């Protein structure tokens, strides 16, 4: 019994140490967005992109189109309902909820070799029209599958509107090595 307790304690302390070593990077806002040269590489690629708009009004529930036998009116929108509740979890007051409304971007990408990679999100917002903004996160010695999250929320979203066009770049040594963009990006 003592052995099991000791093993459990060792596992918890090891996982705590490993979690402390890899803090989640936070995006920094760029004041000036400089154009970069393009040198696309097969060593870097975007795997998947998840976009979510969390607005003040929840999406309307619709009846499932798969089966007429279902009596649950929200069955087709279950994942959207979960995403909304996930993003609003812990927001008690109306002010807390207002700071969570906005655009959420999750980019899943892969690096086949170790490299210092910067993930940059360039975007335009509804009320700012052609004004280009950017946020970026840098990963040292990145290799394998990675996930980068960006959130245009709170006052940025409430004052400037929703994101209407975006592109995400993987940058190595000042060169664009992979790109993912929205349909409206020029």
Report the location of each language-model feature.
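Short, hydrophobic beta-strand segments
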Residues: 149-164
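Contiguous beta-strand segments within globular domains
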Residues: 72-111, 147-152
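Internal, hydrophobic beta-strand segments that form the core of beta-sheet-rich folds
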Residues: 162-176
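A eukaryote-biased signal for short, well-structured alpha-helical docking elements
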Residues: 22-77, 112-115
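Short proline/glycine- and polar residue-rich coil/turn motifs
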Residues: 138-146
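Short beta-strand elements
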Residues: 176-186
């Amino acid at each position: 019994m003592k052995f099991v307790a000791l093993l459990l304690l060792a596992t918890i302390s090891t996982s705590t140490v490993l979690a402390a070593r890899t803090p989640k990077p936070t995006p920094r806002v760029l004041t000036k967005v400089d154009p970069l040269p393009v040198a696309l590489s097969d060593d870097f690629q975007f795997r998947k992109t998840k976009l979510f708009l969390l607005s003040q009004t929840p999406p309307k529930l619709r009846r499932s189109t798969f089966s007429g036998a279902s009596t649950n009116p929200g069955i087709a929108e279950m994942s959207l309902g979960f995403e909304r509740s996930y993003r609003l979890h812990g927001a008690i007051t109306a002010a807390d909820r207002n700071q969570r409304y906005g655009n959420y971007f999750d980019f899943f990408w892969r690096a086949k070799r170790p490299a210092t990679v910067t993930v940059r999100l360039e975007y335009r917002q509804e009320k700012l029209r052609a004004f280009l903004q950017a946020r970026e996160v840098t990963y040292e010695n990145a290799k394998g599958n990675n996930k980068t999250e960006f959130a245009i929320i709170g006052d940025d979203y409430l004052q400037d509107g929703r994101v209407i066009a975006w592109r995400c770049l993987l940058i190595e040594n000042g060169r664009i090595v992979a790109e993912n963009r929205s349909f409206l990006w020029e």
